[in-house]
Amino acid sequence: MSPRAVLVGLPGSGKTTIGKRLANALNLQLVDTDHMLEKKLGKTCNQIMGELGEPAFREQEAIVVAEALQTDGIVSLGGGAVVTESTRELLADHTVVYLNVSIDEGVRRTSGSNTRPLLNVADPRGKYAQLFAQRSAFYEEVSNFMVRCDGKEPRRVVTDILSFIEEVRLERLTERDASHQIRPQ
């Protein structure tokens, strides 16, 4: 088993919203690693981060990500999951979609949220810009496809991703067919 697509991006990029719609469109399950981690440890991500600190949180998160990547469906990773090298390595064989939002749009979408532990600071815009600078290269490294989400309706983002998934499926079929052709001697 392997997920049809893995969604990555900063907090507020739409991983959960788009993930639910994409899973519904494909008649698949959404596997959200933040929710898996919360269920496993019996606490919110905010509580886990506060109690364990970020390094220990990331270790626990990497374990959950490895489990999620063994499922069928659509997988939504926590925004910081890609900072862990082992997670990036695991993503190498998967269809990974980077949901890209600008700093301004990300701040707008996450403002007032109590569920985003790294953004509960005095200067959320500055912190968001810092996360963008730290993580953007990782998102680009692991992704096969990037969707710019600023100003796009969720249905349009889902349509873009569905088109990409279909392209990947057709490429794999073509490669498989080519490898099974009888070659003249």
UniProtKB/Swiss-Prot annotation:
Catalyses which reaction(s): shikimate + ATP = 3-phosphoshikimate + ADP + H(+)
Biological role: Catalyzes the specific phosphorylation of the 3-hydroxyl group of shikimic acid using ATP as a cosubstrate.
Molecular function terms, GO-annotated: ATP binding; magnesium ion binding; shikimate kinase activity
InterPro entries associated with the record: P-loop_NTPase, Shikimate/glucono_kinase, Shikimate_kinase/TSH1, Shikimate_kinase_CS
Protein name: Shikimate kinase
Cofactor: binding details: Binds 1 Mg(2+) ion per subunit.
Family: Belongs to the shikimate kinase family.
Enzyme Commission identifier(s): 2.7.1.71
Residues the record lists as binding ATP: 12-17, 116
Cofactor(s) the protein needs: Mg(2+)
